[in-house]
Amino acid sequence: MENAIRSLQQEISEYELASIKDIEAFRLRYTVRKGLIAGLFGQLKSVLPADKPRMGQLLNQLRQTADDKLAAATAELASAESKTEPKLDLTLPGRRTFIGSEHPVQKVLGEMKGIFSSMGFSIATGPELELDRYNFDLLNFPPDHPARDMQDTFFITRGNANGDVLLRTHTSPVQIRVMLDQKPPIRVICPGKVYRNEAISSRSYCVFHQLEGLYIDKGVSFADLKATIFSFAHQMFGSDVKLRFRPSFFPFTEPSAEVDVSCYLCGGKGCRVCKKSGWLEIMGCGMVHPNVMRNSGIDPEKWSGYAFGMGVDRTVLLRYKIDDIRLLFENDVRMLRQFPA
């Protein structure tokens, strides 16, 4: 057995460990539980009792030699690999950290809320899934109004006991809910997301954001409405912006008007965005229709009020001179980075 130990010791000392593959092969051949060294330990039981102490000492020395050789080779290889890795230059600038910012729609909506809050308006919200009773009936829409058609409105379910369920087409239902829940005087704005079954283009989208306002009190007139809109427009677009009111029709207001501002791109000279008119529509408005007041339990003989509604996304286009509304919904980081926090 002593000869076998001496022979294995010579073999171990001459074994070259130049790579990870060599180290693993050495470990599997000599140092594992079923390796050659363990096999010699298993043969100790057949050695004469007088020779066992010396043979055991030789085997322990052999195992220690193998373990030391394996550890030294592993450390040397790790050290060589670390020297080949590129050094870290602490003088180089670190990677740039990009800080998120508020989306331009939310940024503008926040400014609009601030302007109207300074005028005494509170903020009211409501569900985006709405009943046609609030979206159409109580707002004085006749049964055959085109807005009720599936080509204009996203209906979720029809024929329910409580009425058809739809994605609200405007935030006016919030005004109805407020009038049903509160007694005049009322002064609220209703911001939120709305949905319409429209073709997607540079100027229209199937989902967009609206902000509507409602003011009901004694003696409220159209002059009060105009003063509110002029004040908002000058704070939002600048004191040099021009406005015009055009007579219009809405089922829920009478009289009604649409409000235009001078085109932000051409300065009123006429361009592709304003369709050569020099004007861009920003909102609709009017005095609250008496039928809407009655539907909400408010006496139109005692109270009067005005309402207005505008597209927040359209205002973003005006504010930042963007000519395609689709950019606001694509989440293109290249575009969003232009609006720092």
Swiss-Prot record:
Its main location: cytoplasm. It comes from Chlorobium phaeobacteroides (strain DSM 266 / SMG 266 / 2430). InterPro entries: aa-tRNA-synth_II (IPR006195), aa-tRNA-synth_II/BPL/LPL (IPR045864), Phe-tRNA-synth_IIc_asu (IPR004529), Phe-tRNA_ligase_II_N (IPR004188), Phe_tRNA_ligase_alpha1_bac (IPR022911), Phenylalanyl-tRNA_Synthase (IPR002319), tRNA-bd_arm (IPR010978). GO terms for biological process: phenylalanyl-tRNA aminoacylation. Gene3D superfamilies: Bira Bifunctional Protein, Domain 2. Signal peptide: none annotated. GO terms for cellular component: cytoplasm. It is an enzyme of class 6 (ligase). Tetramer of two alpha and two beta subunits. Keywords: Aminoacyl-tRNA synthetase, ATP-binding, Cytoplasm, Ligase, Magnesium, Metal-binding, Nucleotide-binding, Protein biosynthesis. This is Phenylalanine--tRNA ligase alpha subunit. Its EC number is 6.1.1.20. The keyword Transmembrane does not apply. Mg(2+) binds at residue 254. Binds 2 magnesium ions per tetramer. It is found in: Cytoplasm. Its cofactor is Mg(2+). Belongs to the class-II aminoacyl-tRNA synthetase family. Phe-tRNA synthetase alpha subunit type 1 subfamily. GO terms for molecular function: ATP binding; magnesium ion binding; phenylalanine-tRNA ligase activity; tRNA binding. The keyword Calcium does not apply. It catalyses: tRNA(Phe) + L-phenylalanine + ATP = L-phenylalanyl-tRNA(Phe) + AMP + diphosphate + H(+).
